[in-house]
Design a protein with these regions (language model features):
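Conserved alpha/beta-hydrolase "nucleophile elbow" surrounding the catalytic nucleophile
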Residues: 18-23
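Catalytic active-site module of serine/aspartate enzymes centered on a nucleophile-bearing elbow/loop
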Residues: 134-160
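Active-site loop/oxyanion-hole signature of alpha/beta-hydrolase fold enzymes
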Residues: 1-17, 149
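Flexible "cap/lid" loop of the alpha/beta hydrolase fold
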Residues: 24-32, 37-67
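Hydrophobic, aromatic-rich cap/lid helix
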Residues: 66-93, 109
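Short beta-strand/loop motif that positions the catalytic acidic residue
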Residues: 97-98, 104-106
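Conserved alpha/beta-hydrolase "acid-adjacent" motif
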Residues: 111-116
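Catalytic histidine neighborhood in serine/cysteine hydrolases
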Residues: 117, 121-138
Length: 160
């Protein structure tokens, strides 16, 4: 709800970019408010959430100390609640409705999301897929230079 409220306060259309769970938020927002979204970038984002992944993730989160979450966008409790709220999401039948320009990015070694990246590219009308070499799921940490170049080209309209 806070994300929707925040985006709603912005005048005009917005550029959304999300990685992993953030990509799920961006995807969901784009589907619910297509008139507000100018462009969409999804990095390592699943189009449907594998329930087993969230079960394992939530088990791990329970045992992690609060200090692990200090540099994240959400504290431990909110991260856990966000994950639980997303565990039944499946955008398979809806992504075809996304018409804004979109860039799908996936690390070459991100086996968990490669199939989804290809699915999104095939089912979104104006999407392009870019694979970043020598990179797993955390593209922004593992290869920030290549990610930055892709984003710069996409947002500046100089071609992908």
């Amino acid at each position: 709800a806070a994300f929707i409220e925040y985006c709603g306060r912005i005048d005009g259309r917005i550029h959304l970019c999300g990685l992993s769970l953030g990509g799920i938020l961006a995807l969901n927002y784009t589907l619910d408010f297509p008139e507000k979204v100018k462009t969409l970038v999804l990095i390592g984002t699943p189009h449907k959430v594998p329930k087993i992944m969230f079960r394992i993730q939530n088990m791990i989160f329970r045992f992690l100390p609060e200090s692990v979450f200090q540099n994240m966008a959400f504290n431990k409790r909110d991260t856990f609640l966000l994950g639980n709220s997303m565990k039944n999401l499946d955008f398979s039948d809806r992504v075809k409705d996304i018409t804004c320009p979109a860039l799908i990015i996936c690390g070459k070694k991100d086996r968990a999301n490669m199939k989804s990246a290809r699915y999104l590219r095939q089912n979104m009308k104006n999407a392009k897929l870019k694979i970043i070499q020598n990179t797993g799921h955390v593209v922004n940490e593992e290869n920030p230079q290549d990610l930055g170049r892709l984003l710069d080209k996409f947002y500046s309209g100089t071609g992908i």
